[in-house]
Curated annotation (Swiss-Prot):
It comes from Rattus norvegicus (Rat). Catalyzes the removal of O-acetyl ester groups from position 9 of the free diacetylated sialate N-acetyl-9-O-acetylneuraminate (Neu5,9Ac2) in the cytosol and of the diacetylated sialate residues of sialylglycoconjugates in the lysosomes. Together with the sialate-O-acetyltransferase they regulate the balance of acetylated sialoglycoconjugates, key players in various processes such as cell-cell interactions, host-pathogen recognition, and tumor antigenicity. Residues 1-23 form the signal peptide. The two subunits are derived from a single precursor by proteolytic cleavage. It is found in: Lysosome. Widely expressed. The keyword Disulfide bond applies. Gene3D superfamilies: SGNH hydrolase (3.40.50.1110). GO terms for molecular function: sialate 9-O-acetylesterase activity; sialate O-acetylesterase activity. Inhibited by diisopropyl fluorophosphate and diethyl-P-nitrophenyl phosphate. It catalyses: N-acetyl-9-O-acetylneuraminate + H2O = N-acetylneuraminate + acetate + H(+); an Ac-O-9-sialoglycoconjugate + H2O = a sialoglycoconjugate + acetate + H(+). This is Sialate O-acetylesterase. Its EC number is 3.1.1.53.
Length: 542
Protein backbone atom coordinates (compact mmCIF):
# COMPACT_ATOMS: atom_id res chain seq x y z
CA UNK A 1 0.00 0.00 0.00
CA UNK A 2 1.27 3.45 -0.95
CA UNK A 3 1.27 5.97 1.86
CA UNK A 4 -0.73 9.23 1.36
CA UNK A 5 2.28 11.48 1.83
CA UNK A 6 4.31 10.32 -1.22
CA UNK A 7 1.18 10.45 -3.41
CA UNK A 8 0.51 14.04 -2.34
CA UNK A 9 4.12 14.96 -3.00
CA UNK A 10 4.00 13.42 -6.49
CA UNK A 11 0.77 15.30 -7.24
CA UNK A 12 2.34 18.60 -6.20
CA UNK A 13 5.35 17.93 -8.43
CA UNK A 14 3.10 17.19 -11.41
CA UNK A 15 1.10 20.39 -10.83
CA UNK A 16 4.31 22.39 -10.55
CA UNK A 17 5.62 20.98 -13.82
CA UNK A 18 2.37 21.78 -15.64
CA UNK A 19 2.37 25.33 -14.27
CA UNK A 20 5.97 25.95 -15.31
CA UNK A 21 5.31 24.48 -18.74
CA UNK A 22 2.34 26.78 -19.27
CA UNK A 23 4.41 29.78 -18.29
CA UNK A 24 7.32 28.85 -20.53
CA UNK A 25 4.94 28.35 -23.47
CA UNK A 26 4.02 32.03 -23.46
CA UNK A 27 7.04 34.23 -23.98
CA UNK A 28 8.52 37.09 -25.93
CA UNK A 29 11.00 36.46 -28.71
CA UNK A 30 14.54 36.12 -27.36
CA UNK A 31 15.57 39.69 -28.16
CA UNK A 32 12.55 41.42 -26.63
CA UNK A 33 13.73 42.31 -23.16
CA UNK A 34 14.28 45.05 -20.61
CA UNK A 35 16.34 48.05 -21.82
CA UNK A 36 15.70 47.36 -25.50
CA UNK A 37 15.41 49.99 -28.20
CA UNK A 38 12.52 49.72 -30.65
CA UNK A 39 12.54 51.37 -34.05
CA UNK A 40 11.00 54.83 -34.02
CA UNK A 41 8.76 56.56 -36.56
CA UNK A 42 8.03 56.50 -39.44
CA UNK A 43 8.23 52.72 -39.01
CA UNK A 44 6.23 50.68 -36.54
CA UNK A 45 8.09 48.38 -34.15
CA UNK A 46 7.18 44.69 -34.14
CA UNK A 47 6.50 42.87 -30.86
CA UNK A 48 6.19 39.12 -31.15
CA UNK A 49 6.61 35.87 -29.29
CA UNK A 50 5.29 32.38 -28.66
CA UNK A 51 2.12 31.13 -27.01
CA UNK A 52 -0.69 28.59 -27.05
CA UNK A 53 -2.39 28.21 -30.41
CA UNK A 54 -5.80 29.87 -30.46
CA UNK A 55 -5.15 32.09 -27.45
CA UNK A 56 -5.70 35.86 -27.59
CA UNK A 57 -2.71 38.11 -26.92
CA UNK A 58 -3.08 41.77 -25.94
CA UNK A 59 0.03 43.96 -26.13
CA UNK A 60 -0.04 47.22 -24.18
CA UNK A 61 2.47 50.07 -24.36
CA UNK A 62 2.55 52.17 -21.19
CA UNK A 63 4.43 55.16 -19.86
CA UNK A 64 4.03 55.46 -16.13
CA UNK A 65 0.32 55.10 -15.43
CA UNK A 66 -0.68 56.14 -18.95
CA UNK A 67 -1.67 53.59 -21.58
CA UNK A 68 -0.25 54.71 -24.92
CA UNK A 69 -1.76 51.98 -27.10
CA UNK A 70 -3.15 48.46 -27.13
CA UNK A 71 -2.89 45.87 -29.89
CA UNK A 72 -4.77 42.57 -29.96
CA UNK A 73 -3.84 39.46 -31.92
CA UNK A 74 -4.04 35.68 -31.62
CA UNK A 75 -1.52 32.87 -31.46
CA UNK A 76 -1.22 31.20 -34.85
CA UNK A 77 -0.57 27.51 -35.34
CA UNK A 78 1.42 25.46 -36.12
CA UNK A 79 4.24 27.93 -35.35
CA UNK A 80 2.55 28.95 -32.07
CA UNK A 81 3.64 32.55 -32.67
CA UNK A 82 1.91 35.88 -32.20
CA UNK A 83 2.86 39.30 -33.56
CA UNK A 84 1.68 42.91 -33.40
CA UNK A 85 2.94 46.06 -35.07
CA UNK A 86 2.96 49.10 -32.82
CA UNK A 87 1.91 52.48 -34.13
CA UNK A 88 4.92 54.64 -35.10
CA UNK A 89 6.41 56.36 -32.07
CA UNK A 90 8.57 59.43 -31.68
CA UNK A 91 12.04 58.85 -30.21
CA UNK A 92 12.23 58.74 -26.45
CA UNK A 93 11.12 56.81 -23.39
CA UNK A 94 11.22 54.98 -21.11
CA UNK A 95 8.16 52.82 -21.71
CA UNK A 96 6.85 49.47 -20.49
CA UNK A 97 5.61 46.77 -22.87
CA UNK A 98 3.11 44.29 -21.45
CA UNK A 99 1.77 41.21 -23.23
CA UNK A 100 -1.17 39.21 -21.84
CA UNK A 101 -2.28 35.83 -23.17
CA UNK A 102 -5.90 34.83 -22.56
CA UNK A 103 -7.15 31.30 -23.15
CA UNK A 104 -10.57 30.52 -21.69
CA UNK A 105 -10.18 31.52 -18.03
CA UNK A 106 -6.37 31.50 -17.93
CA UNK A 107 -4.36 34.71 -18.17
CA UNK A 108 -0.57 34.92 -18.41
CA UNK A 109 1.28 38.24 -18.38
CA UNK A 110 4.75 39.29 -19.54
CA UNK A 111 6.43 42.66 -18.98
CA UNK A 112 9.58 44.40 -20.14
CA UNK A 113 10.57 47.80 -18.78
CA UNK A 114 12.84 50.74 -19.61
CA UNK A 115 12.10 50.45 -23.32
CA UNK A 116 13.21 53.29 -25.61
CA UNK A 117 12.26 54.26 -29.16
CA UNK A 118 15.04 55.31 -31.52
CA UNK A 119 17.01 53.84 -34.41
CA UNK A 120 18.05 50.19 -34.42
CA UNK A 121 21.21 49.16 -36.30
CA UNK A 122 22.39 45.60 -36.87
CA UNK A 123 26.18 45.08 -36.96
CA UNK A 124 27.61 41.93 -38.51
CA UNK A 125 30.70 40.40 -40.09
CA UNK A 126 33.85 38.61 -39.02
CA UNK A 127 36.62 39.32 -36.52
CA UNK A 128 37.22 43.01 -37.26
CA UNK A 129 33.57 43.60 -36.43
CA UNK A 130 33.77 41.21 -33.49
CA UNK A 131 36.75 42.98 -31.84
CA UNK A 132 35.73 44.58 -28.55
CA UNK A 133 36.50 47.98 -27.05
CA UNK A 134 39.02 46.23 -24.80
CA UNK A 135 41.16 45.49 -27.90
CA UNK A 136 41.31 48.93 -29.53
CA UNK A 137 43.47 52.02 -29.08
CA UNK A 138 42.71 54.11 -25.97
CA UNK A 139 40.62 51.27 -24.57
CA UNK A 140 40.71 52.54 -20.98
CA UNK A 141 39.39 55.96 -21.95
CA UNK A 142 36.72 54.49 -24.21
CA UNK A 143 35.56 52.10 -21.47
CA UNK A 144 35.29 54.91 -18.94
CA UNK A 145 33.25 57.05 -21.32
CA UNK A 146 29.85 55.36 -21.03
CA UNK A 147 27.89 57.52 -18.58
CA UNK A 148 26.89 60.02 -21.27
CA UNK A 149 25.58 57.26 -23.54
CA UNK A 150 22.99 55.44 -21.44
CA UNK A 151 20.47 55.86 -24.27
CA UNK A 152 22.70 53.83 -26.58
CA UNK A 153 21.64 50.27 -25.78
CA UNK A 154 23.54 47.13 -26.79
CA UNK A 155 22.63 43.51 -27.55
CA UNK A 156 24.85 40.62 -28.66
CA UNK A 157 23.88 37.36 -30.37
CA UNK A 158 25.51 34.08 -29.32
CA UNK A 159 27.80 32.24 -31.72
CA UNK A 160 25.48 29.55 -33.03
CA UNK A 161 24.96 27.79 -36.33
CA UNK A 162 22.08 25.87 -37.86
CA UNK A 163 21.40 23.77 -40.94
CA UNK A 164 17.94 25.29 -41.41
CA UNK A 165 16.53 28.78 -40.92
CA UNK A 166 15.56 29.35 -37.28
CA UNK A 167 12.53 31.36 -36.20
CA UNK A 168 14.17 32.67 -33.02
CA UNK A 169 17.70 32.98 -31.69
CA UNK A 170 19.15 29.87 -30.12
CA UNK A 171 21.28 31.91 -27.73
CA UNK A 172 22.01 35.43 -26.52
CA UNK A 173 25.44 36.48 -25.26
CA UNK A 174 24.34 39.86 -23.96
CA UNK A 175 20.69 40.75 -23.42
CA UNK A 176 19.67 44.34 -24.07
CA UNK A 177 21.81 46.41 -21.71
CA UNK A 178 22.94 49.89 -20.91
CA UNK A 179 26.63 50.30 -21.79
CA UNK A 180 29.18 49.70 -19.04
CA UNK A 181 32.92 49.14 -18.92
CA UNK A 182 32.11 45.54 -18.05
CA UNK A 183 29.93 44.65 -21.01
CA UNK A 184 31.90 46.70 -23.55
CA UNK A 185 35.25 45.35 -22.37
CA UNK A 186 34.23 41.82 -21.49
CA UNK A 187 37.15 40.18 -23.33
CA UNK A 188 38.71 39.66 -26.74
CA UNK A 189 36.26 39.02 -29.58
CA UNK A 190 33.35 38.53 -27.15
CA UNK A 191 30.10 40.30 -26.30
CA UNK A 192 29.99 43.71 -27.98
CA UNK A 193 31.60 44.96 -31.19
CA UNK A 194 33.83 48.04 -30.85
CA UNK A 195 33.01 49.26 -34.38
CA UNK A 196 29.30 48.84 -33.66
CA UNK A 197 29.51 50.65 -30.32
CA UNK A 198 31.57 53.56 -31.65
CA UNK A 199 29.35 53.89 -34.73
CA UNK A 200 26.28 54.12 -32.50
CA UNK A 201 27.98 56.56 -30.19
CA UNK A 202 28.90 58.89 -33.05
CA UNK A 203 25.32 58.69 -34.34
CA UNK A 204 23.98 59.54 -30.89
CA UNK A 205 26.26 62.58 -30.70
CA UNK A 206 24.67 63.82 -33.93
CA UNK A 207 21.05 62.70 -33.53
CA UNK A 208 20.61 63.06 -29.75
CA UNK A 209 18.02 60.31 -29.47
CA UNK A 210 18.21 56.60 -28.53
CA UNK A 211 20.24 54.17 -30.62
CA UNK A 212 19.90 50.38 -30.41
CA UNK A 213 22.89 48.27 -31.48
CA UNK A 214 22.60 44.56 -32.26
CA UNK A 215 25.92 42.73 -32.67
CA UNK A 216 25.91 39.43 -34.59
CA UNK A 217 29.44 38.56 -35.75
CA UNK A 218 31.82 35.60 -35.87
CA UNK A 219 35.53 35.77 -36.67
CA UNK A 220 37.19 33.73 -39.40
CA UNK A 221 34.05 33.39 -41.51
CA UNK A 222 33.48 33.81 -45.27
CA UNK A 223 30.50 35.63 -46.71
CA UNK A 224 28.90 32.34 -47.73
CA UNK A 225 28.00 31.46 -44.13
CA UNK A 226 26.09 34.76 -43.76
CA UNK A 227 24.19 34.33 -47.05
CA UNK A 228 20.97 32.45 -47.66
CA UNK A 229 21.04 29.49 -50.01
CA UNK A 230 18.86 31.49 -52.40
CA UNK A 231 21.42 34.30 -52.57
CA UNK A 232 24.29 31.89 -53.14
CA UNK A 233 22.39 30.03 -55.83
CA UNK A 234 21.77 33.31 -57.65
CA UNK A 235 25.54 33.77 -57.91
CA UNK A 236 26.27 30.20 -58.99
CA UNK A 237 28.04 29.35 -55.75
CA UNK A 238 28.40 25.57 -55.36
CA UNK A 239 26.29 24.15 -52.56
CA UNK A 240 28.76 22.91 -49.96
CA UNK A 241 26.49 23.02 -46.93
CA UNK A 242 27.33 19.37 -46.20
CA UNK A 243 31.06 20.07 -46.37
CA UNK A 244 33.34 22.13 -44.19
CA UNK A 245 35.60 24.36 -46.24
CA UNK A 246 38.50 25.24 -43.97
CA UNK A 247 39.45 28.89 -43.96
CA UNK A 248 42.77 30.31 -42.75
CA UNK A 249 42.76 32.65 -39.79
CA UNK A 250 45.66 35.03 -39.33
CA UNK A 251 48.03 35.17 -36.39
CA UNK A 252 51.22 37.14 -35.79
CA UNK A 253 54.62 35.50 -36.13
CA UNK A 254 58.01 37.09 -35.51
CA UNK A 255 60.41 37.24 -38.42
CA UNK A 256 63.88 37.52 -36.96
CA UNK A 257 63.01 40.35 -34.56
CA UNK A 258 63.24 39.86 -30.84
CA UNK A 259 61.33 42.99 -29.82
CA UNK A 260 58.33 45.04 -30.83
CA UNK A 261 60.35 48.22 -31.16
CA UNK A 262 60.00 50.29 -34.31
CA UNK A 263 63.56 49.33 -35.26
CA UNK A 264 62.13 46.04 -36.37
CA UNK A 265 61.39 46.80 -40.05
CA UNK A 266 58.50 44.42 -40.36
CA UNK A 267 56.86 41.29 -39.12
CA UNK A 268 55.06 38.83 -41.24
CA UNK A 269 51.71 37.30 -40.50
CA UNK A 270 50.91 33.88 -41.80
CA UNK A 271 47.81 31.67 -41.82
CA UNK A 272 47.64 29.32 -38.88
CA UNK A 273 45.43 26.32 -38.27
CA UNK A 274 41.78 26.95 -39.11
CA UNK A 275 39.80 28.40 -36.21
CA UNK A 276 36.32 27.54 -35.04
CA UNK A 277 34.61 30.03 -37.34
CA UNK A 278 32.30 27.90 -39.49
CA UNK A 279 32.52 27.83 -43.27
CA UNK A 280 29.51 25.65 -44.08
CA UNK A 281 27.31 27.73 -46.32
CA UNK A 282 24.34 29.59 -44.80
CA UNK A 283 24.71 28.27 -41.23
CA UNK A 284 25.12 31.73 -39.66
CA UNK A 285 22.42 33.23 -41.84
CA UNK A 286 20.17 30.48 -40.52
CA UNK A 287 21.08 30.89 -36.85
CA UNK A 288 22.29 34.47 -36.30
CA UNK A 289 20.53 36.66 -38.91
CA UNK A 290 17.27 35.02 -40.03
CA UNK A 291 15.92 34.84 -36.43
CA UNK A 292 16.13 38.66 -36.30
CA UNK A 293 13.92 39.14 -39.36
CA UNK A 294 10.92 40.40 -37.35
CA UNK A 295 13.00 43.17 -35.77
CA UNK A 296 12.26 46.55 -37.35
CA UNK A 297 15.62 48.05 -38.34
CA UNK A 298 16.96 51.39 -39.44
CA UNK A 299 19.94 49.78 -41.17
CA UNK A 300 22.94 47.45 -41.15
CA UNK A 301 26.71 47.94 -40.92
CA UNK A 302 29.03 45.17 -42.08
CA UNK A 303 32.76 44.39 -41.82
CA UNK A 304 33.80 41.20 -43.60
CA UNK A 305 35.87 40.02 -46.55
CA UNK A 306 39.24 38.88 -45.26
CA UNK A 307 38.22 35.21 -45.38
CA UNK A 308 37.17 35.50 -49.02
CA UNK A 309 40.57 36.75 -50.17
CA UNK A 310 41.44 33.17 -51.13
CA UNK A 311 37.99 31.60 -51.25
CA UNK A 312 35.45 32.29 -54.00
CA UNK A 313 37.16 35.67 -54.44
CA UNK A 314 35.95 36.15 -58.01
CA UNK A 315 32.34 35.56 -56.94
CA UNK A 316 32.43 38.21 -54.20
CA UNK A 317 31.28 40.97 -56.57
CA UNK A 318 28.07 38.99 -57.00
CA UNK A 319 27.75 37.50 -53.52
CA UNK A 320 27.98 40.77 -51.60
CA UNK A 321 25.21 42.62 -53.50
CA UNK A 322 23.17 39.39 -53.33
CA UNK A 323 23.63 39.22 -49.55
CA UNK A 324 22.48 42.83 -49.21
CA UNK A 325 19.45 42.21 -51.44
CA UNK A 326 18.56 39.04 -49.54
CA UNK A 327 18.82 40.65 -46.12
CA UNK A 328 16.72 43.59 -47.29
CA UNK A 329 13.98 41.36 -48.66
CA UNK A 330 13.91 39.15 -45.56
CA UNK A 331 13.78 41.98 -43.01
CA UNK A 332 11.20 43.89 -45.04
CA UNK A 333 8.92 40.84 -45.24
CA UNK A 334 9.62 39.63 -41.71
CA UNK A 335 8.34 42.79 -40.05
CA UNK A 336 5.35 43.23 -42.37
CA UNK A 337 6.98 45.99 -44.38
CA UNK A 338 8.04 48.12 -41.40
CA UNK A 339 11.76 47.87 -42.21
CA UNK A 340 12.38 49.83 -45.40
CA UNK A 341 12.59 47.65 -48.51
CA UNK A 342 15.98 49.14 -49.40
CA UNK A 343 17.18 50.00 -45.91
CA UNK A 344 20.63 51.64 -45.62
CA UNK A 345 23.54 49.19 -45.66
CA UNK A 346 27.01 50.40 -44.69
CA UNK A 347 30.26 48.47 -44.80
CA UNK A 348 33.97 48.77 -44.18
CA UNK A 349 36.31 48.28 -47.11
CA UNK A 350 39.15 45.97 -46.08
CA UNK A 351 42.03 47.47 -44.16
CA UNK A 352 45.69 46.46 -44.58
CA UNK A 353 47.52 43.23 -43.98
CA UNK A 354 51.30 42.96 -43.70
CA UNK A 355 52.87 40.29 -45.90
CA UNK A 356 56.49 39.27 -46.22
CA UNK A 357 56.39 38.28 -49.87
CA UNK A 358 55.05 40.14 -52.88
CA UNK A 359 51.74 38.29 -52.90
CA UNK A 360 48.74 40.53 -52.28
CA UNK A 361 46.64 37.75 -50.74
CA UNK A 362 43.64 38.94 -52.75
CA UNK A 363 42.92 42.03 -50.66
CA UNK A 364 42.97 44.56 -53.56
CA UNK A 365 40.52 42.42 -55.52
CA UNK A 366 38.19 42.00 -52.54
CA UNK A 367 38.22 45.76 -51.91
CA UNK A 368 37.18 46.28 -55.52
CA UNK A 369 34.56 43.52 -55.41
CA UNK A 370 33.10 45.05 -52.23
CA UNK A 371 31.87 47.85 -54.51
CA UNK A 372 30.55 45.37 -57.13
CA UNK A 373 33.52 46.48 -59.27
CA UNK A 374 32.35 50.10 -59.46
CA UNK A 375 34.98 51.49 -57.10
CA UNK A 376 32.50 53.47 -55.00
CA UNK A 377 29.01 53.30 -53.55
CA UNK A 378 26.12 53.89 -53.86
CA UNK A 379 26.05 52.50 -57.40
CA UNK A 380 23.45 50.82 -59.66
CA UNK A 381 24.12 47.36 -58.19
CA UNK A 382 24.36 48.59 -54.60
CA UNK A 383 21.76 51.34 -54.04
CA UNK A 384 21.43 53.07 -50.67
CA UNK A 385 24.80 51.83 -49.43
CA UNK A 386 27.78 53.61 -47.89
CA UNK A 387 31.41 52.62 -47.36
CA UNK A 388 34.22 53.44 -44.95
CA UNK A 389 37.65 53.20 -46.59
CA UNK A 390 40.12 51.67 -44.14
CA UNK A 391 43.20 50.76 -46.20
CA UNK A 392 45.20 53.60 -44.58
CA UNK A 393 44.56 52.41 -41.00
CA UNK A 394 47.35 49.83 -40.90
CA UNK A 395 48.68 48.54 -37.60
CA UNK A 396 51.88 46.52 -37.92
CA UNK A 397 52.24 46.19 -34.13
CA UNK A 398 48.74 44.96 -33.36
CA UNK A 399 48.97 42.14 -30.79
CA UNK A 400 46.10 40.51 -32.65
CA UNK A 401 47.97 40.48 -35.97
CA UNK A 402 48.15 43.26 -38.53
CA UNK A 403 44.95 41.96 -40.06
CA UNK A 404 43.23 43.28 -36.91
CA UNK A 405 44.15 47.00 -36.72
CA UNK A 406 43.26 48.66 -33.44
CA UNK A 407 42.07 52.04 -34.74
CA UNK A 408 38.37 51.33 -34.78
CA UNK A 409 37.49 54.92 -33.86
CA UNK A 410 38.38 56.19 -37.34
CA UNK A 411 36.56 53.27 -38.97
CA UNK A 412 33.39 54.05 -37.01
CA UNK A 413 33.71 57.79 -37.63
CA UNK A 414 33.94 57.27 -41.40
CA UNK A 415 31.01 54.85 -41.26
CA UNK A 416 28.88 57.34 -39.37
CA UNK A 417 29.61 60.04 -41.97
CA UNK A 418 28.27 57.68 -44.63
CA UNK A 419 25.20 56.94 -42.52
CA UNK A 420 24.50 60.62 -41.99
CA UNK A 421 24.61 61.23 -45.74
CA UNK A 422 22.91 58.08 -47.06
CA UNK A 423 20.66 56.88 -44.22
CA UNK A 424 19.69 60.28 -42.80
CA UNK A 425 19.90 62.41 -45.94
CA UNK A 426 22.20 65.07 -44.52
CA UNK A 427 23.05 67.51 -47.30
CA UNK A 428 26.38 69.16 -48.06
CA UNK A 429 28.26 66.57 -46.02
CA UNK A 430 31.48 65.13 -47.41
CA UNK A 431 31.26 61.45 -46.53
CA UNK A 432 33.69 59.79 -48.95
CA UNK A 433 37.10 60.52 -50.38
CA UNK A 434 37.90 61.85 -53.87
CA UNK A 435 36.87 59.74 -56.86
CA UNK A 436 38.35 60.11 -60.37
CA UNK A 437 35.66 61.41 -62.72
CA UNK A 438 37.83 61.74 -65.83
CA UNK A 439 41.00 59.94 -66.90
CA UNK A 440 42.67 61.29 -70.02
CA UNK A 441 45.87 60.21 -71.75
CA UNK A 442 47.99 63.13 -72.96
CA UNK A 443 49.90 61.15 -75.55
CA UNK A 444 52.34 63.82 -76.79
CA UNK A 445 53.60 64.56 -73.31
CA UNK A 446 53.60 60.96 -72.08
CA UNK A 447 51.34 62.04 -69.24
CA UNK A 448 48.07 60.81 -67.77
CA UNK A 449 45.62 63.37 -66.40
CA UNK A 450 43.31 62.36 -63.52
CA UNK A 451 40.50 64.76 -62.65
CA UNK A 452 38.74 64.13 -59.33
CA UNK A 453 35.19 64.91 -58.30
CA UNK A 454 36.32 67.05 -55.34
CA UNK A 455 39.33 68.95 -54.15
CA UNK A 456 42.28 66.76 -53.29
CA UNK A 457 45.25 66.81 -50.99
CA UNK A 458 48.30 64.84 -52.14
CA UNK A 459 50.02 63.68 -48.96
CA UNK A 460 52.94 61.96 -50.63
CA UNK A 461 54.43 61.50 -54.08
CA UNK A 462 56.07 58.17 -54.83
CA UNK A 463 56.52 55.82 -57.73
CA UNK A 464 54.48 52.94 -56.30
CA UNK A 465 50.95 54.05 -55.47
CA UNK A 466 49.81 54.66 -59.06
CA UNK A 467 50.48 52.03 -61.71
CA UNK A 468 49.80 51.80 -65.42
CA UNK A 469 49.19 48.76 -67.59
CA UNK A 470 51.80 48.94 -70.33
CA UNK A 471 51.11 46.75 -73.36
CA UNK A 472 53.52 45.67 -76.09
CA UNK A 473 53.42 42.70 -78.48
CA UNK A 474 50.05 41.59 -77.05
CA UNK A 475 51.46 41.40 -73.53
CA UNK A 476 50.74 43.79 -70.68
CA UNK A 477 52.43 44.41 -67.36
CA UNK A 478 51.93 46.87 -64.54
CA UNK A 479 54.56 49.57 -64.19
CA UNK A 480 54.92 52.41 -61.67
CA UNK A 481 53.58 55.82 -62.71
CA UNK A 482 55.03 58.55 -60.46
CA UNK A 483 53.01 61.68 -59.70
CA UNK A 484 54.35 64.47 -61.92
CA UNK A 485 52.31 67.47 -60.81
CA UNK A 486 48.99 68.12 -59.12
CA UNK A 487 46.57 70.97 -58.51
CA UNK A 488 43.28 71.43 -56.65
CA UNK A 489 41.36 68.65 -58.40
CA UNK A 490 43.84 67.32 -60.92
CA UNK A 491 46.74 64.93 -60.69
CA UNK A 492 49.15 64.17 -63.55
CA UNK A 493 51.12 60.92 -63.80
CA UNK A 494 54.42 60.38 -65.57
CA UNK A 495 54.17 57.55 -68.12
CA UNK A 496 57.76 57.57 -69.33
CA UNK A 497 58.39 54.07 -67.96
CA UNK A 498 56.05 52.63 -70.60
CA UNK A 499 57.54 52.16 -74.07
CA UNK A 500 54.37 50.57 -75.39
CA UNK A 501 50.67 51.45 -75.15
CA UNK A 502 49.14 52.55 -71.87
CA UNK A 503 45.91 50.59 -71.48
CA UNK A 504 44.81 51.07 -67.85
CA UNK A 505 45.63 52.74 -64.57
CA UNK A 506 45.17 51.67 -60.97
CA UNK A 507 45.64 53.22 -57.55
CA UNK A 508 46.64 51.66 -54.21
CA UNK A 509 46.36 48.17 -55.65
CA UNK A 510 48.18 46.35 -52.89
CA UNK A 511 47.36 44.77 -49.56
CA UNK A 512 49.42 47.38 -47.66
CA UNK A 513 49.05 50.61 -49.69
CA UNK A 514 50.60 53.02 -47.20
CA UNK A 515 51.59 53.66 -43.63
CA UNK A 516 49.06 54.88 -41.07
CA UNK A 517 46.96 57.71 -42.57
CA UNK A 518 49.68 58.37 -45.15
CA UNK A 519 48.11 57.23 -48.41
CA UNK A 520 48.70 59.42 -51.44
CA UNK A 521 45.35 61.11 -52.05
CA UNK A 522 42.84 62.49 -49.53
CA UNK A 523 40.05 65.00 -49.42
CA UNK A 524 41.42 68.42 -48.52
CA UNK A 525 40.24 67.91 -44.95
CA UNK A 526 42.75 65.01 -44.71
CA UNK A 527 40.02 62.96 -43.04
CA UNK A 528 38.81 60.83 -45.96
CA UNK A 529 41.18 58.88 -48.22
CA UNK A 530 40.53 58.28 -51.90
CA UNK A 531 39.49 54.64 -52.36
CA UNK A 532 41.51 52.26 -54.54
CA UNK A 533 40.49 51.99 -58.17
CA UNK A 534 41.37 50.38 -61.47
CA UNK A 535 40.18 51.73 -64.81
CA UNK A 536 40.69 51.30 -68.53
CA UNK A 537 41.85 54.41 -70.36
CA UNK A 538 39.25 55.46 -72.91
CA UNK A 539 39.96 59.20 -73.31
CA UNK A 540 43.05 59.97 -75.34
CA UNK A 541 44.06 63.57 -75.91
CA UNK A 542 46.13 64.98 -78.72
Amino acid sequence: MVSPRPVGLMLLLIIARVSRGAGIGFRFASYIDNYMVLQKEPSGAVIWGFGTAGATVTVTLCQGQETIMKKVTSVKGPSNTWMVVLDPMKPGGPFEVMAQQTLETTNLTLRVHDVLFGDVWLCSGQSNMQMTVLQIFNASKELSDTAAYQSVRIFSVSLTQAEEELADLDGVDLSWSKPTAGNLGHGNFTYMSAVCWLFGRYLYDTLQYPIGLVSSSWGGTPIEVWSSRRALKACGVPNTRDERVLQPEIKPMRNGCESKESSCPFRRFVPCDPVAGPATHSVLWNAMIHPLQNMTLKGVVWYQGENNANYNRDLYACMFPALIAGWRQTFHSGCQGQTERFFPFGFVQLSSYLLMNSSDYGFPEIRWHQTADFGSVPNPKMPNTFMAVAMDLCDRDSPFGSIHPRDKQTVAYRLHLGARAVAYGEKNLTFQGPLPKKIELLARNELLNLTYDQEIQVQRKDNKTFEISCCSDHQCKWLPAPVNTFSTQTLILDLSACLGTVDAVRYAWTTWPCEYKQCAVYHTSSVLPAPPFTARITHRGI
